[in-house]
Every structure is written in C-alpha cells, then in structure tokens.
C-alpha cells in the first residue's frame, strides 16, 4: 500500500476507543492461601498497567461496591490513600468517578458492573488530567472474590504481555488456503465435466447443480445489499443475529451435503430407491443413502445451532460447516471473465476499507461498524456472535486466557471473494492448456496475502480487513502471469469460455477433412486424451457427443442444417484472442 494510505489508516485506528484486557491478582490480607487471578477491562488512555506482576505492589482493596461514587458525599471520611477503590457502576460518567477517587488519594479505581463490560471512555482532556488506572470488574467475579477470600483482600492490577504470534494462525492459514485451493480446483473441474459430458435426464440424482454466472449488475446489487445488511446489523443486531444464524444453518447443511454427495454415491450399499409417490422431492425417487446423507447434514447443522456457544468444541463444527459452505459457493457461483473478477474484488476492497477505517468517523461511539458487527456490539443483550467466520481458539498459554477473547477469526468473505478469482484462473488454465499456472500462481498469491495480513495483525495489534492485502496480491499476480504469457486479451474477456459451452481444447484453423475417429484420437496430445476420457465411460445407450449435432461438445466442424463450415479461432498459450 502507499505510505499515505497506511498513515491515514493508522490515524483512523488511533481515533477508536482503546480497550485492553488485564488481570486482577487477589490475595487474602492475612496471607496464607494462594492468590487468584480475575479478568478486568481497562482503558490504557487513562493510565497504563505494568506488564510484570513482580513489579506491582499489592494494595488494599477498599470495598465501596454499594456506592457509585458520583459526588463528594460518597467519599468516605477515611480517604483512599494507598488503596484501590472498588465502586459500583452507574449514575455518572467514568471520569467523575475516577476524578473523585484520585482526589481522595486512590492508586487505582475498580468499577464493578452487573452488565457486560465496556471500555471506560473519556475524552482527551480528561485522559490528560487522570493518572491512575481505571478498570471494570464483573459482578460475578466480585462475588467469587468475597466467597473465597472475604472482604479484606490485597489486590494488584497488571496487563501481562501476550505472545506476539499464536499458533492458531497456522491452523487458520491451512484452512483458508486449503479451502481456496480445493474450491477453485473443484469449480474448474466441475465446469469441464459439464462441458465435456452429454447431459442426461434419466438419472436425476446424478445431475449437478448449475453454476450461476455473475454479471456486473449482480455485483453492484450484491454490494449494495451487503452495505444495507451491515448497517441493519449495526442498529438491530440483537434481532437480526438469529436470522443470520438460521440462514447459516440452512446454507451450511446444503453445502455439507453437496461436498459429501459425490463420495456417498460411490458407496456400494443403500442403493435402493423410495417407492413411487407424489410427495415433493420424493416423487423423484431418491436413493436411501442420499436421504441418510441429507438427514446427517441437517443433524450436524442443528447440533451446532443448539450448542453453538460451547467454546470447548462447537468451533470445530462451525469451521467444518463453514468450509463446506465456502466450497459449495465457490463451485456454484462463477465469475465468467477477469473483468468481472476485477470489478467484484475492487468494489469489495473499497467496501472493506470504508466500513473498517472510515466508519469510526461516522459513528457516535467512534467504533468501526465492521468490527462491531463481526465481534458483537458491546451493548448487545444476547451476547451472540455472527457465525460467518472461521474461528480457532488461542493455543498459547497466557494469564489473559481467562478473559473472554479466546478465538482468532477469519471471515468467509476473505475466503470466498479471492476464491472466486482462483476458480476463474483454474477454468482459464483448462481452456488454454497452461498446466494450471494461473491457478497455482493465484493460490500462492492468496497464501502470501494472508501471511501479510497476519503480520499486519501482529504489528498493529488490531483486527485487519484481510481484503486490504488479499485483493492486491491476487489481482496483480494474475495480471502479471497473463501479461508474461501474452494472454491478457483472452484472460480479460474469458475468450468466450463462459458465453457458450465450448470444449476446453482448441480447434484447428480452417476446414479440415474428416478423419477416422480412431486415428484422430490416437493423434491427440496426452492432455486432450485425459480431457476426453469421460466420453469413453458413458453408459450403454448414451449418445456419442461427437456424432450428435445437438450436443454442446459436438465436433466444431460438424455442419448443421446446411450451414457452411467456418473456421474457429485458436486460443493457445503465448497468444491473445
């Protein structure tokens, strides 16, 4: 990125409300038993907490948890000298509480909250006036402290340093790159089989889902809908989050079925069919094994929906369903040209930057709309999270692991959007017989872009819009390969690959006299023999596509209705259409 853009991004990040987790170490005032740690939320703009517990002095906790400390009347006669004040949240601002505590000699302020913890905010002038730390403690943790240690305790506030890199990033990297590579490969192979294989209507279960070609109008409508939905989620999160969860359950079960169906069809058992009937869907007489598969996929989705908040294991189901959903979408949605790929990626590139870096200037809270929606608003009453992410718990041990942020996230959009470009590259590879150089290069570029995202995440210590790094890496790499091979014209327009069902091999130029079928097959290159191999395995009674004038893969020189044979341009590596 340009230096100016990076500087602007950093300035916008600084404008957001700072919020960090810390640790409250509690020991009994009488000594004896071992201490215990509790999670706190603090704002370092009031005052920073030390990172090393050994450099922190234990101070007495002054319990005024029944007082809100909003006026001088709430300050006890015996002030807070060399003590940490504990007060209740409410009735006045954080600044008023901490100003009174600091004026009474307190070395820190703990605010107990029965609601969800939120960052203790202030403004720049107030931050400069205050020199003691301010932190929030949950009411549940306070009750546990009193139950274990009583009301006479010594406490210390500190913020231990976290590991710069967590091993869960490796798992997220493998899942993301693997999904993009597998989805792109599957999408290209699926299209080739559809073009090369004569469609048959006598076996409904073997029919593949039709791909959906994306047009520029569809891209614009999609982006507008994304913006509209994101704003709705920002203002009506508690109501719409359950709608999103329901949609995810339905879509992910469909994706899981689509991924497992090809494997299940190869099993040698449960091939019996449903008896004749007039029921919806069942009138097609599906096989028993496919019904069992559908039941299994729905069950997995329902189990996740019921136990989605079980942090110990529900994330495994969510990631499995999410990967299946992404693979299904990459196979179903098709960008027909590189022009469409560029339009989609650039528009979503701007969309991602706007909702992460620009919206903090437009919201009253100063928070990013994208970050608020992705992580769940701090004032949400449901505490639900959107499921449209891959999530992996933190694997490194840290005192901060007791706080409520154990997962690293990667949104589905950061997989699907570049993945559609990877899928297009694979289809173009097959068209020009380029040994999959576009597919491999774009997949590697995606992996490098994801690594850059992780590095930025570590350096900036803040959630990053991954498309900021993924879009330039994948688009520039694809363009570079096309220019190097002198195929930019064909790569940009798709060379008619999406406009008509063509075979992936190039036809010879000019009229060529008919040849014996066996001789022509023997003269084909090895790559073309492999491409045509599905035709040799057609079931008995199927029509030979080469002899059927209505077949989409009929020979390019087969005249129909007296039309004159016309030469077809060749698209070969090293040339442009």
Swiss-Prot record:
Record-level Gene Ontology MF annotations: aspartic endopeptidase activity, intramembrane cleaving; protein homodimerization activity
Enzymatic class: hydrolase
UniProt entry tagged with the keyword NADP: no
Gene Ontology BP terms: membrane protein ectodomain proteolysis; membrane protein intracellular domain proteolysis; membrane protein proteolysis; regulation of immune response
Record's subunit section: Monomer. Homodimer. Interacts with ITM2B and TNF.
Comment on protein domains: The PAL motif is required for normal active site conformation. The catalytic domains embedded in the membrane are in the opposite orientation to that of the presenilin protein family; therefore, it is predicted to cleave type II-oriented substrate peptides like the prototypic protease SPP.
Protein name: Signal peptide peptidase-like 2B
Organism field: Rattus norvegicus
